[in-house]
Regions:
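The feature primarily captures lumenal catalytic ectodomains
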Residues: 1-251
Length: 251
């Protein structure tokens, strides 16, 4: 007997994303909204995540980009794929053509555990209306105080920071000014940039602070993550660059 109505089980945790390319091809939107919101939601299932990032949750193994092809979720600095692969080394991705393939098979797939991600839908939530941020809905859920630790620790270890002793915990503050002067776009007028650098270095000389004037486009992705993890105070002319700092373990 041939059965045509049976479902085929996909027995792994799966993310199904409905975002369009314009809302995902930037590190801020992909990591600081989609990934951050996904894990904040998923981690609410385990209120006992430890400081060391140990969780009873199964690691997501699939992400399906329903409306994107393989190139449309990547950002120019290529941080999106770096963070996703470092956070979930075993994750596999499927794209719009794969979604069509599955639909055309004419068979249902039973997902063991699935989380739907839709930025446009989250903007209709009551919490988002209060603060104007799609993440507000996910952040309203209960959860462990260390809910982000599993993601941050995976990414930091991937960047070569083995544990928190590699980060600044004691000692002088680390001030990082992310300069955009050579990149163009949102940047300070030259004289204001020079004055800011001068004043930051005066803090270094007077108080012993570590001061970094960094052009991120000159650093590798690992170097960017390591610098962000060590930074105590970040200074930038463009707020979305601060989203690198979310990979610090303690938020």
């Amino acid at each position: 007997m041939i059965q045509h109505n049976c479902a085929f089980c996909v027995a792994v945790a799966c993310i199904i994303d409905f975002c369009n390319p314009c809302s995902i091809q930037h590190y801020y939107h992909f990591v600081a909204e989609l990934l951050f919101g996904f894990w904040r939601t998923y981690s609410s299932l385990d209120p006992s995540i430890s400081d060391s990032g140990i969780s009873a949750l199964s690691t997501p193994r699939r992400i399906w980009f329903v409306h994107l092809d393989a190139s449309q979720w990547r950002d120019p600095p290529r941080l999106n794929e770096w963070v996703l692969r470092s956070a979930f080394p075993s994750l596999t991705a499927e794209y719009s053509n794969d979604w069509i393939d599955r639909a055309e098979l004419g068979r249902p797939f039973l997902l063991d555990r699935v989380l739907f991600s839709d930025r446009a839908a989250s903007m209709q939530g009551k919490h988002e209306h209060k603060v104007g941020r799609p993440l507000a809905e996910a952040c309203s859920l209960p959860g462990s105080l260390r809910w982000w630790s599993p993601i941050a620790r995976n990414a930091l270890q991937f960047a070569g920071l083995v544990d928190e002793s590699s980060m600044v915990a004691t000692g002088p503050p680390v001030i990082t000014y992310i300069s955009r002067q050579k990149r163009g776009g949102r940047m300070l007028v030259p004289e204001h940039h020079e004055r800011l650098v001068e004043e930051l270095y005066s803090l270094r000389d007077k108080y012993g602070y570590e001061v970094n004037v960094a052009s991120m486009e000159k650093l590798s992705r690992e170097e960017q993550i390591r610098l962000a993890a060590r930074t105590t105070v970040s200074v930038d002319t463009y707020c979305k660059r601060y989203s690198l700092c979310i990979l610090r373990c303690r938020l």
